[in-house]
Structure formats: structure tokens, C-alpha cells
């Protein structure tokens, strides 16, 4: 990645156990039932010699072990394995039949019980979300929202991915009115074209010429599905999607560079490289917009790239090393 300046900022690491740590199927299977038995068997009769006691206390039979098979709620296979394990234990240890039979009945009843969890209500989620925003933010900061009612004058234009995990307002703590944000698959900026991808062109034009933003940021992120698609879709031949393949090929030069320089590298590592290189391609594409070049030449606009790694909780920011000169006539 060719950069004039680059720095990495460590940010607090927020770990989501449900998304970052998943048990594998193999580990789930092996952990379905774990029971360890220690059995001491001896034959005795009324005429047998009493056992020699370590302590002068009566000898009682060891209590039956507590057997607690575990299974996951998202499939029947683990449940069936738990039952099979109990049945196998019955064959080997017949004296535990009452305990195992009770546990089988309990497991079966729990598996058959209806799910009491309330179904997700999207309308209620939207309503409660707005109520929370209004009571905690809108009502508590009237000066800000009174000012926003008069208009907007953001300093930043941000291109970010549509991925639900990388909202720039949360990641960079943007407040309302601070950033004019465009989100699309893989945070890409296509070259200037009046007839194709006009939605992006309109956003850039509005941000630069009307809002007078001072910075344009293009921010990539870790584990981007759009970039993985770019790296795995065939460069030629029929498409398997209606829109996605054409769109991500906006940054095909990034893929070509990564493959040429890191051929043989594992796909996951290539994707990380391409996530950043695609940002550089988008920054280069911004230079094809005449009003962007004018802003750079007049020092009223700057372009920067970034990469948010939500796995490790880091953020990188850089500026491309490029120069613009005024045209000359011959």
C-alpha cells in the first residue's frame, strides 16, 4: 500500500462472545456427555469376613453419580447423542438404570417443551429504538437539534461499507451533522461517469460543491464479504449474480495487484490486503471527478483512506502519496 503517512490507533476491544467464539461441531459432539465412573465391586455374603475399615464408621454404598448430559438447542443430533450415551451407560452399568431412566425422561420432556421466547417484533424494535433516541439524545440536547434544523455543514464525507458491523457513526463517534455518509457494498467509489453509478457521483458532487466538505474518507474493514467476493469471483465468464459481481469489479485493479504481489498467499490474507488496496483504488477513482481535483488543487479538500479491524479493535488511517499540477498549454 503506497502511503504518504500511516498510523494505527488501538481502540478499546469489544468482544462479542456470540459472534467471535463459536464451538465447532466436533467439539460439541465430543462434549455431549461426559461422565466418569469409579466402581469398586466385591462379592459379599453373610459368612464373609467384614471389611477392614480405615475409620471406625459404617460402610455405605456410594451414591449414584449425578448424570447431566448437555445438548445444544439448535439441532437434534446432540440430543440424540446424549440419549445414546445414556443407553450405552445402562448396558455397561445396569445398577444405574433408575437414574439414567429419570434423566432420559427429563431430557425428552425438555426437548419437547415449546419455545417460550417471544418472537422478534421488528415494528416494536423500531418504535423502542426511536423512543430511546428521543428521550436520551433528542430531548437532552435541544441546542444541537435546533441548529441542525437550520441546515447541515459537515466537515467529512465518508464512504463506508453497508456491513451491519461497521457503522461509521459508532466506530468513529460521529455526532449528527458531522459526516455526510455514503454506504455501499465494500465501500467502493467508481470512476467519474455521468451515465453509470450516478448515485455515487451525485453524492460526491453534492458533498464537495454544495456542502463544502473538507475531507473525504474511504474506510474499509476486516472480513468484508464484498472484498471476498471480488477475490473469488471469476474475472471473466458468466455472472452468478445480477448486481454484485459488476459492482465489486469497480476495484478489480486491487485484486490484480494483490494476486500479482502475493500469489500463493492464503485467501484470508489476500482478502486483508485487498480490503486496504481497494480503498486506494477508490481514492484514485475520486481523482477522476473534476470538482474533487479542483478541491485538491485549491487545498480546500483532502482525501484519506482507512481500515477498521473489528476483530482486533484497531483502526488505520492514511493519505495517498500523489501530486496534482495545473494544466499547461502548448
Curated annotation (Swiss-Prot):
Fetch the InterPro entries from UniProt: Beta_CA_cladeB, Carbonic_anhydrase, Carbonic_anhydrase_CS, Carbonic_anhydrase_sf
Name the Enzyme Commission number(s) assigned to this protein. 4.2.1.1
- Reaction catalysis annotation: hydrogencarbonate + H(+) = CO2 + H2O
DNA-binding listed as a keyword: no
Chain segments annotated as transmembrane:
none
What CDD domains does the record point to?
A: beta_CA_cladeB
User: This protein's superkingdom?
Assistant: Eukaryota
Its family remark reads: Belongs to the beta-class carbonic anhydrase family.
| Record remark: domains | Possesses a transit-like peptide, but it is proposed that this peptide is not removed and that therefore the enzyme stays in the cytoplasm instead of going to the chloroplast.
Write out the function statement from the record.
Reversible hydration of carbon dioxide.
Can you say what this protein is called? Carbonic anhydrase
